[in-house]
Structure formats: C-alpha cells, structure tokens
C-alpha cells in the first residue's frame, strides 16, 4: 500500500533477532525465575534460554512498551536496556463487561490464576487451612494440588469461560493473589472494575495501584499477614463493605479503553 507506514510489533521473547518497532513486555523472564526459584537461571535451561531471547528481543527493538513501572525497571537493570526507549503502557479491559450490576451477597474469598508455585500456591493453601470458617473459590485452568482436597471450605472451578468471570467477581468478597511475581495482571483490574477489593503481595498491578492510593487495593508482607488482611475484609459489616465496593467502582475509568487510547497515542507520538 503506497503511503502507508507499518509498525512491526512483537511480544516478549517471540522475535529475539528481528528489528521490531515496538516490543510489548508483559513481564521479565529472568526476574520471574529469580524471584520464584530464588536463584539465577542456568543459561542452558528453558528459563535461561527464554531470558536470553528476551534480552536480545529488547536490544533489537526500537521501542519497548512495558506494562508497569516495575517491568520497565527490570528490563533496564537485568537486561541493560536503555530506559529512554522503554515506555509504560498499561493494560485495559472492556468496562461494559465488568460492572457493578447484580452485586449482592458477596460470599467467597476468590483466587484466580494457575495453581502453581509462582502464583503462591503454598501460601494459598496455608491461608485456606487457617481460615476454616471462610469459603474460598479457586478459579484456575488446572486442578488444585491433592492437599486441597482435605479442605472442606474450598470450591474449585476449572476452565471457567471468560464471559463468566464478571459473575465470579460479583460473588467474591475479596480477590486474594499471593503471587510472587506479576507484570500487570488483568485479573486485578477485572476484579476492581466489579468493585471487588484485592489483596496480595507487593507485585504487579497491586504494587502499582497501591502506590497510587487506588481504593480497595491492599498489600500484605507474608502469608500470615495476607490471611489477617483477608479476615479483616470479610469481617467488615455490610454497610462499610459495600461502601468500599462502590468507592472502588467509582474509579474504574482508569482502566477504560479510552484511557488506554490516550496512553497509546502519547507513546506512539512521543519524540525520540
């Protein structure tokens, strides 16, 4: 097409030796591995090779769009990528799909994500076990480990269609995310846009939004603290609790497609 300029856009480590106009960084493989495994990845391991590809993808790209300020710093510090070519462009969702309609008796403490080590599965088990009078709903793409079967307060749902997720959040008293690493997880945004409070560790969207004093976002330091914060939230009387949900809901425009378009346009047009 004459007169048309095309942009080459890639994600993460998908195109390590190709000159992209924009590389979208949803996280950092090296930081993920070091955080979860508490050691550096072996260069010839799967994580080591993916980190290698990711680093070179960043080096060959003209611009990098990181989903959070933390991810931007990870690419700068761990891959030695010049911070001037990294812009922060956050995720967004369809606000019309995630709303406050039909929110009534919120009953569960809900977890959404893969039930694996990086998502804090051991901490999640500890919390479920130590709050036996609290109902938990685990929503995942894979079954829960066998030890969860002994807990009578845990309901597990596998492969829930995305269209059903708003209903999950509307029935959730609180979303709990004990992840050790996140980039800028959509599940936090989706929950907040239904007015559901979120608690987790100092990672991902929780980290960024807590720093910006976004209502309904709570940070815990460890699994004991996480259980305590969860208990305080589920123990709120209904008047205070639903006032909190309405306050959260009132700030949801931050995650709108229109807001994302503004950030996107600014990132495209910024002078180099």
Stretches found by the model and what they are:
Residues 43-64:
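Membrane-proximal helix-turn-helix segments that form the acceptor-binding/catalytic region
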Residues 70, 92:
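Carbohydrate-associated surface elements
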Residues 145-166:
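Nucleotide-activated donor-binding/catalytic signature segment of Leloir-type glycosyltransferases, i.e.
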Residues 167-172:
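Short alpha-helical donor nucleotide-sugar binding micro-motif in glycosyltransferases
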